C-alpha cells in the first residue's frame, strides 16, 4: 500500500457514496455524471491476477503522452518506484525487477475491445456534492464492483471468496474548463493514469493497495500546457487487476464535466 504516492489533497473533503454507479440519467451535457466504459477480463489474461511482489506504485509503465487513438501507450513492463508527494515523478534510489505487465501486445488489450479477450459494458458514474453549496464533488467506494457477478465473465477469478467480479478496466473521457484552484484527487487500486490535455498528470501504475495522488492544476499548468479559462480533455484509465480488494475514490472541486466521444 502506498498512500501519499501523490500529494494528499486533504483540503478537499467528500462524503461516501454507494459503490457501483449503475445506469443513471446523464441529464445535461455539463455536469457531475461521468460516462464510463468498462472492459471485463478473465484470469486467463496474463496481466490480470498475475503473480507479483512489492505491492507499490510503479511509474513509467505508460508513455507521458496519449497515443493518436486517445489511449495510453505502453512504455515498460517493470516501471519505476514512485517519488512520494509527486503525481508523476520517480524515485531514483531503487529499481524494481519483477514485471507487472507482460508485453505491449497484452497491454494494448486493456482499453481496446478485443473479441475473445474482454467484454465491453457502458455505464455511468455519479459524482455527488459533499453538501449543498460546497462545490466539492466525489465518489467513494471501498468495494468497487461496478460489474455484477452476472455480467461479463461473471465471478472472476473463479471461486474468489468474495464472490465478486474482479479483473476489469475503467475508461472515462471528458472535457472541463480550467479555473484557478482546481484539484482532482484519486485514491484506489490498482493502476490509475489520468491525462490532461493529452499529458500524463497522475501516474499510479501497477498492482497495489489503495494509493492516493492529486492533480494540482495550478502547480502543473505549465507542464500540462493549460491556461485559465481554456477547455481541456481529461482522459482517465483505471484497472482492477488483482484480488482481494477494490477501492475507487474521486474528490474534486471541478463541478462540470462534458462527456467526450473517442472513436
Language model segments and positions:
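N-terminal Sec signal peptide cleavage junction
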Residues: 1-8
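Acidic/polar, compositionally biased interaction segments
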Residues: 12-263
Amino acid at each position: 500500500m502506498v498512500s501519499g504516492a501523490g500529494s494528499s489533497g486533504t483540503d478537499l473533503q467528500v462524503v461516501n457514496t454507494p459503490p457501483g454507479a449503475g445506469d443513471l440519467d446523464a441529464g445535461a451535457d455539463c455536469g457531475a455524471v461521468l460516462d464510463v466504459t468498462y472492459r471485463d477480463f478473465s484470469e486467463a489474461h496474463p496481466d490480470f491476477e498475475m503473480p507479483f511482489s512489492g505491492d507499490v506504485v510503479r511509474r513509467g509503465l505508460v508513455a507521458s503522452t496519449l497515443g493518436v487513438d486517445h489511449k495510453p501507450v505502453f512504455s515498460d513492463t517493470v516501471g519505476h518506484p514512485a517519488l512520494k508527494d509527486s503525481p508523476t515523478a520517480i524515485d531514483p534510489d531503487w529499481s524494481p525487477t519483477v514485471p507487472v505487465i507482460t508485453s505491449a501486445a497484452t497491454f494494448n488489450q486493456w482499453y481496446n475491445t478485443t473479441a475473445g479477450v474482454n467484454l465491453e459494458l457502458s455505464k455511468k458514474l455519479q459524482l455527488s456534492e459533499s453538501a449543498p453549496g460546497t462545490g466539492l464533488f466525489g465518489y467513494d467506494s471501498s468495494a468497487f464492483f461496478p460489474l455484477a457477478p452476472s455480467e461479463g465473465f461473471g465471478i472472476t477469478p473463479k471461486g474468489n471468496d468474495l464472490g465478486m467480479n474482479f479483473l476489469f478496466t475503467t475508461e472515462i473521457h471528458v472535457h472541463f474548463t480550467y479555473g484557478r484552484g482546481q484539484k482532482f484527487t484519486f485514491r484506489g487500486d490498482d493502476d490509475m493514469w489520468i491525462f490532461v490535455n493529452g499529458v500524463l498528470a497522475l501516474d499510479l501504475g501497477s498492482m497495489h493497495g489503495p494509493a492516493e495522488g492529486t492533480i494540482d492544476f495550478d502547480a502543473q499548468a505549465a507542464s500540462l500546457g493549460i491556461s485559465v479559462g481554456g477547455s481541456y480533455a481529461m482522459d482517465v484509465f483505471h484497472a482492477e487487476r488483482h484480488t482481494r480488494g477494490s477501492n475507487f475514490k474521486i474528490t474534486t472541486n471541478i463541478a462540470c464535466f462534458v462527456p467526450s466521444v473517442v472513436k
